[in-house]
Amino acid sequence: MPQLNTTVWPTMIAPMLLTLFLITQLKVLNTNYHLPPLPKTMKMKNFCKPWEPKWTKIYSLHSLPPQS
């Protein structure tokens, strides 16, 4: 049974690893990463609160005669 010749293996593995490293580096360099979000200025919104009294027909008493 013939012996497996392994003398050329290091000369094949070293360039292969170098090539894989370079390809990986090029892919990482060309990747567009998202920028961190900028802080957003928060504006205070006026929400309608049910406890704020607003005079509408809903609040008028039914027992009183209509006023014009």
Curated annotation (Swiss-Prot):
One of its GO terms (cellular component) is proton-transporting ATP synthase complex. The modification N6-acetyllysine is found at residues 54, 57. Keywords: Acetylation, ATP synthesis, CF(0), Hydrogen ion transport, Ion transport, Membrane, Mitochondrion, Transmembrane, Transmembrane helix, Transport. It comes from the Eukaryota. InterPro entries: ATP8_mammal, ATP8_metazoa. The chain crosses the membrane at residues 8-24. It is a single-pass membrane protein. The modification N6-succinyllysine is found at residue 54. One of its GO terms (molecular function) is proton transmembrane transporter activity. Pfam families: ATP-synt_8. It is found in: Mitochondrion membrane. GO terms for biological process: proton motive force-driven ATP synthesis. Its main location: mitochondrion. Subunit 8, of the mitochondrial membrane ATP synthase complex (F(1)F(0) ATP synthase or Complex V) that produces ATP from ADP in the presence of a proton gradient across the membrane which is generated by electron transport complexes of the respiratory chain. ATP synthase complex consist of a soluble F(1) head domain - the catalytic core - and a membrane F(1) domain - the membrane proton channel. These two domains are linked by a central stalk rotating inside the F(1) region and a stationary peripheral stalk. Belongs to the ATPase protein 8 family. Component of the ATP synthase complex composed at least of ATP5F1A/subunit alpha, ATP5F1B/subunit beta, ATP5MC1/subunit c (homooctomer), MT-ATP6/subunit a, MT-ATP8/subunit 8, ATP5ME/subunit e, ATP5MF/subunit f, ATP5MG/subunit g, ATP5MK/subunit k, ATP5MJ/subunit j, ATP5F1C/subunit gamma, ATP5F1D/subunit delta, ATP5F1E/subunit epsilon, ATP5PF/subunit F6, ATP5PB/subunit b, ATP5PD/subunit d, ATP5PO/subunit OSCP. This is ATP synthase F(0) complex subunit 8. The gene is MT-ATP8.
